[in-house]
């Protein structure tokens, strides 16, 4: 999704 993956890149950060 947009704000649901545990990645530190993109529109959202992990957490």
From Swiss-Prot:
Subcellular location: Secreted; Nematocyst
GO CC list: extracellular region; nematocyst
Keywords from the UniProt entry: Disulfide bond, Ion channel impairing toxin, Nematocyst, Protease inhibitor, Secreted, Serine protease inhibitor, Toxin
UniProt superkingdom: Eukaryota
Coiled coil: none
Predominant cellular place of this UniProt entry's protein: secreted
Annotated site residue numbers, Reactive bond for trypsin: 13-14
GO molecular function, one term: ion channel regulator activity
Family: Belongs to the venom Kunitz-type family. Sea anemone type 2 potassium channel toxin subfamily.
Stated role: This recombinant serine protease inhibitor inhibits both trypsin (Ki=2.4 nM) and chymotrypsin (Ki=23 nM). It may also inhibit the TRPV1 receptor, a receptor of the pain pathway. In vivo, shows anti-histamine activity, since it dose-dependently weakens the clinical manifestation of the allergic reaction induced by histamine injection. In vivo, does not show toxicity to mice by intraperitoneal injection.
Note, other: A synonymy between H.magnifica and R.crispa is controversial.
Protein name per UniProt: PI-stichotoxin-Hcr2k
Organism: Radianthus crispa
């Amino acid at each position: 999704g947009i704000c649901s993956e545990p990645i530190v890149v993109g529109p959202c950060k992990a957490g």
